[in-house]
UniProtKB/Swiss-Prot annotation:
GO terms for molecular function: structural constituent of ribosome. The keyword Ribosomal protein applies. The keyword Coiled coil does not apply. It comes from Clostridium botulinum (strain Eklund 17B / Type B). HAMAP family: Ribosomal_uL29. This is Large ribosomal subunit protein uL29. Transmembrane segments: none annotated. Pfam families: Ribosomal_L29. InterPro entries: Ribosomal_protein_uL29, Ribosomal_uL29, Ribosomal_uL29_CS, Ribosomal_uL29_sf. NCBIfam families: L29 (TIGR00012). PANTHER family: 60S RIBOSOMAL PROTEIN L35/50S RIBOSOMAL PROTEIN L29, LARGE RIBOSOMAL SUBUNIT PROTEIN UL29C. PROSITE patterns: RIBOSOMAL_L29 (PS00579).
Length: 70
């Protein structure tokens, strides 16, 4: 993700982030299935999706910690 996309994610509400996280997890499942069957065209997409999942989880955790501090 680019810096601009990360800023957009940070300004999103947790419900939207959770929905996006679910979509990315489903996409990762499909990519892994395609990899196992030999149909995956772009193996780098798996890395990109995993990185996006980690970034969204980090943003959700930051929001959670910020809420606990207040």
């Amino acid at each position: 993700m680019k810096a601009r996309e990360l800023k957009e994610l940070r300004s999103s509400n947790p419900q939207d982030l959770t929905l996006k996280l679910g979509d990315l997890k489903a996409e990762l499942f499909n990519l892994r299935f395609q990899l196992a069957t030999g149909q995956l065209e772009n193996p780098m997409r798996i890395r990109e999706v995993k990185k996006s999942i980690a970034q969204i989880k980090t943003i959700l955790r930051e929001d959670e910690m910020r809420a606990l501090e207040q």
